UniProtKB/Swiss-Prot annotation:
This is GTPase Era. One of its GO terms (molecular function) is GTPase activity. Residues 125-128 are annotated as: G4. Residues 39-43 are annotated as: G2. PROSITE patterns: G_ERA, KH_TYPE_2. Residues 61-64 are annotated as: G3. Monomer. It is found in: Cell envelope; Secreted, Cell wall.
Amino acid sequence: MAEFRSGFVCLIGRPNTGKSTLTNALVGTKVAITSMKPQTTRHTIRGIVHREGNFQIVLVDTPGLHRPRTLLGKRLNDLVRDTYTEVDLIGLCIPADEATGPGDRWIVNQIRSVAPKTILVVIVTKIDKVPKDRLSAQLVAVSDLVADSAEIVPVSAVTGEQVDVLIDVLAAALPPGPAYYSAGELTDEPEELLMAELIREAVLEGVHDELPHSLAVVIDEVSPRAGRGDLIDVHAVLYVERPSQKGIVIGKSGARLREVGIAARRQIEKLLGTNIYLDLHVNVAKNWQRNPKQLGRLGF
């Protein structure tokens, strides 16, 4: 009988390369925020892929590695680099529909510098978005980028194509080890953090590019409704940096915030398996990304 294999896998790449969507596809449920806006993942969220008697893959979903412009950006990059050295395998995500460039080379150099002994697998994402000839050209470019030093797996997290192949490749590269989590667990993140991420995802749909970096969500209180065993009250505060951003989030006569509340409530009800009442408030915390005290208060 083959030895049980287990370990930690870090999915990295430039912002918006499909890391969070891939995490959700591998796990089979939503555990990571998947907005189309760059740099939307703030916390290291672990998803767990378990095959009874065979293997367990613990996925670590990090923010996109980038050249930082704010104190928050620097802290996010530090989080990514710390993760590199603590995992068994790094999965570098490169999208099939974007040419490789200086940003990808910079990340490859960071990996080789910080974690030269960690196994590297290159995952070419979003293959459903390109024709076969363009995919072939991208695979050649990616091979040149890593100088044939890593296995390359093309996948589509949206259609599911090659996802099982990727799981097998990741599992085969892990060392023999125990199951770190029980078979029923899909993530080890607290429910309040997952709720905050789902609210952020709802806010970020269809807004201007500057807002993702300026938005933080804090769950203020979660409590059962008195006399209603089937209803939970969730109170959350959305923090932005400028009054103009507050206007974007709220919208004309509160219309935008109501849309956010409806979308987020549906996702949170799926997460909790019960009805919820979602109460949202928007506050301005001026320049919170550059203020160490504000960062600490908001969980960074």
